[in-house]
């Protein structure tokens, strides 16, 4: 069936800012989908408020709207753009919920918009717990004993009738938001309130707990001809009870018999056919490990986190195919681009094993509740590919960028057996490492299985690693060829082996190469070598010979180092930079080699770089790839702190770094050298010192004068930063040795206006598209600040002063490429706060708002062009953008959103308008439309007057009485007290927006005069182009 020619324009709904449960995987799926639609000649209208994404670039859509993802906003865009079709199954839960709302309110019918792909009826059958259960009963597909409830009384009555523990699953939510396992009545009573609040239709499923069953997922595709295939099946190492996003996942499944596999495959195909899904669908099962009894847990009638994982695990482009199916194609009409010969109706086959390992934010949030359950808490994930499970597990662990040594966390070595058992039975993010610690202490596999319900197969796999560790320690420096080869085959890194035999990583590498033990590189081809595949997708292993032909061509080869897993401080914006670096290098005639390990991202789409290597971002693996490819140079400016941290080791390995030498990086990261540089250039900065001991820290803080800012070096996202107001507070902080990784930096804290610039330089001149002004004072991390660009109060004199400072720094360092500089304006004085010699998280924002392709320009400068050659210019526009932070308070409990120098937001959004008040008002559309009650604490009197003048009602009673009433719009709480923290957390758990900074409050209240209307990026630009003189 050919494509649908009755439609010519399609509205695509994106997933919005990154939050836990809905992250970079939707940029990958959305980008694939937009590319697929553009290939077919459709006009694509994209609505997505996330500026950090690839999909919101001009190349992927004809009109791009950074607008609130609300039904009201989409209705206005539909009236303006008059699309023929709407595609909602690429934008996660956000897009699905909006599609249902637009259908139910009659907007789609009124404006003649056809919902493409999966119908609203199908969405409701998958998402509405009552309709889902009814359909499963019709199909005779077993579901756990359950009850659909819409009030607390009915919920409690049912829970008590079936007995605790029970699982609570809210309808129309993602990442298990609002749900969980309630072990008893007390926990249930608290959880059911939050669960009903979390569901947009106030509906929950309360079901008998089947925690401890195996959790199995099938990723399935279906077309309009009812042709169905399973793309991939996956097995969670953690049993049912831990959200799949928080579980280590293996593909293909490892412990199912063929009968089990076929039984669940048949059930998957039955379900997707009955749902009438057109596109991709994820189906989750619970399987009794002691029988053939299974239950259907959940169906996601859309592309999902698991879809992205399945796509990267198999090489099958699920989102791209889903978009093509949505416009009428069938699976037997579409070719798999990875093989070039098989059709999309051909089920992938794997001759390797993949492991997905979640990445949690608890290295930043040490006091948060890290226990795992049915509510997802991971911010991102890594994926590893290997020929055996032991090696895949070890590669995945090496990809996490934690303080682990192989499969061990040093912090666990001092814990008692009883404490380790507690952590294993009631799991948190360290569970895998806890199990490895138990095994290393000779605890039996049977005991661990009995208490954790982890399948013995996986535990034996883990124990194989421990046994090989013991053999390596016994051998010591007398390491045989056979033992070293075995260790490498099982995934032991050079660094881990070095730690076991008391040698350096360099010594192990030299010994390995001397023995002729080097990796081979195998291809991912979707067909297990059954067909001749033209693939460029590789992974390393120590089995067999290298696949494919990578013989040297005439082109120079560039290695681009990616940014690894999504975590707070290093999000999808760095993938944006890496992808544009690759595309520009290709335009310039280079062969591009991408190394990364994040299955959610566009950069790990095999169609982006000339060759893709899915590998840990460690020195060993990066150097292995560089040697295999015989690269000419590497670029570390586009991969965030991950790539920057690899710079020294890469230079030592003889790899040329383009644009940024390690010496330059060291000058900017080491505070002593940095301040010496600024002093030499005559640039003002806050007073700062380095302290190597507790006593030195106390002495230097007193010398500088309070308040001071304390932080470690070489970090991103402000990790470990804190503002200290007094000697007493410092003493308390210094007594906590774990929080102070010496040496530490102690800077004078200056509370002024913060401004940042993203610039490009050829080593002589600099080009600055705009000056981004933070709304909050300095001291609030730039990633957590609201920011306006172009900055409205940055005078021409201040602009010139900042440009002069930037030019002095770039010339002194002979810096080429892209750089971010943060300034504080204090009583008219310009102080240099920080210089980041890499692409920053604001690069995508600046690029899109100002119409300047920052990364392509920076890449050309790295390749040898001058600014004079490029003559960059900003597009003349008559609008403004406001960037705003987004926090995942629904997932990470006990983390206060009181802003400070350590970043806490998981993502960012952006709204554009013709004035700043209108842009700001869009961010809080629902608050302004409601204009309900506000609770104020510790605010100036005139703020109260501003709120009343804006039409809000001020609650004069206690916080407790305010929380008992309905119609609450906003909690404004500027206090730093413990009571205030608890109040903020309670407000957030009820979905009430919270402001913690006076500057944000004032900007918000002033925005009431704005007049929001849909504004696309193209609407902002005029036809003529103006040269940038900043």
Curated annotation (Swiss-Prot):
What pathway is this protein said to act in by its record? Amino-acid biosynthesis; L-arginine biosynthesis; carbamoyl phosphate from bicarbonate: step 1/1
Q: Where does Mn(2+) 4 bind?
A: 834, 836
Residues the entry annotates as binding Mg(2+) 2? 298, 300
What keyword terms does UniProt attach to this protein?
Answer: Amino-acid biosynthesis, Arginine biosynthesis, ATP-binding, Ligase, Magnesium, Manganese, Metal-binding, Nucleotide-binding, Pyrimidine biosynthesis, Repeat
Known catalytic reactions? hydrogencarbonate + L-glutamine + 2 ATP + H2O = carbamoyl phosphate + L-glutamate + 2 ADP + phosphate + 2 H(+)
The record's top EC class is ligase
* Sequence ranges assigned to domain ATP-grasp in this UniProt record: 133-327, 675-863
Picking any one GO molecular function of the record gives: carbamoyl-phosphate synthase (glutamine-hydrolyzing) activity
Show the segment(s) annotated as Carbamoyl phosphate synthetic domain: 549-928
Entry-linked InterPro entries: ATP-grasp, ATP_grasp_subdomain_1, CarbamoylP_synth_lsu, CarbamoylP_synth_lsu_oligo, CarbamoylP_synth_lsu_oligo_sf, CbamoylP_synth_lsu-like_ATP-bd, CbamoylP_synth_lsu_CPSase_dom, MGS-like_dom
GO CC annotations? cytoplasm
Q: How does it assemble?
A: Composed of two chains; the small (or glutamine) chain promotes the hydrolysis of glutamine to ammonia, which is used by the large (or ammonia) chain to synthesize carbamoyl phosphate. Tetramer of heterodimers (alpha,beta)4.
Quoted from the entry, the domain comment is: The large subunit is composed of 2 ATP-grasp domains that are involved in binding the 2 ATP molecules needed for carbamoyl phosphate synthesis. The N-terminal ATP-grasp domain (referred to as the carboxyphosphate synthetic component) catalyzes the ATP-dependent phosphorylation of hydrogencarbonate to carboxyphosphate and the subsequent nucleophilic attack by ammonia to form a carbamate intermediate.
Q: What is this protein called?
A: Carbamoyl phosphate synthase arginine-specific large chain
Natural source organism:
Bacillus subtilis (strain 168)
Q: What is the lineage of its organism?
A: Bacteria, Bacillati, Bacillota, Bacilli, Bacillales
